[in-house]
């Protein structure tokens, strides 16, 4: 499997629960390296731009409102098969359907307040990483 990078966001609900460290431990325990990280409180414009792919969907406004409701922790993860590995760690979008031991099963409250975001493919990972991190701010270790 190839070394990949993926974007991960710890959403406002999980940041408010003070579980950033527990989530980071899961990333690292799965062999993923955190090669860039920053905390931010997204503006409405940034959240709308980042989630523009969902603009026509009925949940778009609620998603944007949620993502600007508090600070988020944004990180780039790197490792063998990082995209799929992170998605496995996150679990199903709906925490009620997520397997026990996944981030969403353990820390999410609802399908809307679902604790984390992760890129779903190499192409989207590249776009999402570039959105938050200029190349000079991502460091392989």
Curated annotation (Swiss-Prot):
GO molecular function: ATP binding; metal ion binding; nucleoside diphosphate kinase activity
Keywords: ATP-binding, Cytoplasm, Kinase, Magnesium, Metal-binding, Nucleotide metabolism, Nucleotide-binding, Phosphoprotein, Transferase
Catalytic activity as recorded in UniProt: a 2'-deoxyribonucleoside 5'-diphosphate + ATP = a 2'-deoxyribonucleoside 5'-triphosphate + ADP; a ribonucleoside 5'-diphosphate + ATP = a ribonucleoside 5'-triphosphate + ADP
Residue numbers annotated as active site: 117 (pros-phosphohistidine intermediate)
Record's subcellular location: Cytoplasm
Gene Ontology process terms (BP): CTP biosynthetic process; GTP biosynthetic process; UTP biosynthetic process
Pfam families: NDK
CC per GO annotation: cytoplasm
Catalytic activity, EC: 2.7.4.6
List of residues binding ATP: 11, 59, 87, 93, 104, 114
InterPro entries cross-referenced by the UniProt entry: NDK-like_dom, NDK-like_dom_sf, Nucleoside_diP_kinase, Nucleoside_diP_kinase_AS
Keyword Glycoprotein attached: no
Cofactor (UniProt): Mg(2+)
Functional description taken from the UniProt entry: Major role in the synthesis of nucleoside triphosphates other than ATP. The ATP gamma phosphate is transferred to the NDP beta phosphate via a ping-pong mechanism, using a phosphorylated active-site intermediate.
Subunit structure: Homotetramer.
HAMAP family from the UniProt entry: NDP_kinase (MF_00451)
Record-stated family: Belongs to the NDK family.
Protein name: Nucleoside diphosphate kinase
Organism taxonomic ancestry: Bacteria, Pseudomonadati, Pseudomonadota, Betaproteobacteria, Burkholderiales
Gene name in the database record: ndk
């Amino acid at each position: 499997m190839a070394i990949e990078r993926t974007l991960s966001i710890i959403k406002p609900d999980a940041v408010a629960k003070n579980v950033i460290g527990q989530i980071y431990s899961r990333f690292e325990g799965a062999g993923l390296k955190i090669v860039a990280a920053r905390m931010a409180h997204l503006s409405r414009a940034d959240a709308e731009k980042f989630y523009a792919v969902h603009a026509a969907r009925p949940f778009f406004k609620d998603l944007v409102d949620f993502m600007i409701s508090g600070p988020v922790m944004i990180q780039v993860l790197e490792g063998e098969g990082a995209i799929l590995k992170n998605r496995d760690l996150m679990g199903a979008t709906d925490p009620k359907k997520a397997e026990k031991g996944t981030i969403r099963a353990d820390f999410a409250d609802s399908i809307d307040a679902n604790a984390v975001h992760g890129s779903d493919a190499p192409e989207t990972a590249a776009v999402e990483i570039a959105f938050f991190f200029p190349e000079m701010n991502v460091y392989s270790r």
